Amino acid sequence: MPIAIRCLAAFAFAVSPITSVPAQPPGPQVDLGINADLKGWRLLPNDSPWHRDISGDPVDPNSERILARIGWHKPLHPDFGTEHEGAPIGIPYIVVSGNQPRVRVTFTEAPQESDPGPYPIPRDAPIEGGPNGKGDRHVLVLDRDAWMLYELFNAFPDGKGGWRAGSGAIWNLKKNQERPPRWTSADAAGLPILPGLVRYDEVVGAGKVEHAIRFTLVKTRRAYIPPASHWASKAFDDDLPPMGMRMRLKADYDLSSFSPEAQVVLQALKTYGMMLADNGSDNFITGAPDPRWDMAALRQLRRVTTKDFEVVDMAGMVADQPRR
């Protein structure tokens, strides 16, 4: 989606510490509402793969071939921001309390790989792309009291107080979870979505992003690397990227000329990388919408291209084999 450019007033970062996931959920310490401030709480345990520092991981032997297939000069694209043509840019989420009523969800595309629920989805839960969106229509709900995450793909209100969706997954954020092998989630790779989003409260509020960032590519392989659990491709080429693949911004890439916001994102890409989660436009990194984003600052990320990355070691990859 093309991004409308809006210049907002400059601001100073107020850096606050990132807090580990507690033994008990944070509850009222986290705000309620759409795209709410998580007050520095990590969504997943400290030892989650999403929080793993990959800056010292070896480069995969197939890195250059994979990057060439993507296209050396394809730009990084921030697929989040303020709004475009009346719809928020990015994947929104909503934080609810533990007493949010649960409703029925009917699954229409992958019911056998979806968690049946019920799900605590408010009637006014934001939908990716807006109520009339034509894209993936993700719905993400975080229960702050149970520290549980509920996610839907291709979600529509059913007119009876419930929802219908293509697929859905429920995540207990107090521990590390993976979907069963070859199961999808609300994302093609079988991963949770919210933990990989770039959020305003991280970039501006905390001044740091301490997790891998979700991203998409046009062409992928029938393969995945855990914690991913699912592929969404008909191609077997070994120089195509598998789901769950991580690309890392090169350590010597100079960040000094970028805006403070862009530097936060790029430093995360050096430390934690970006994790391939879905088929989509090349090098699109995903975040949550917020009217306070400085679009001119985010647009600077487009100066980075595929050639500035490297694919980290893909040990543990699960690959399908063509039938003979």
Task: Enumerate the language-model features and the residues they cover.
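N-terminal secretory signal peptides that target proteins for export/translocation
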Residues: 1-3
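Bacterial N-terminal signal peptides
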Residues: 6-17
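Sec/Tat signal peptide C-region and signal peptidase I cleavage site
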Residues: 19-22
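Short, surface-exposed polybasic-aromatic patches that bind anionic ligands, especially phosphate groups
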Residues: 24-324
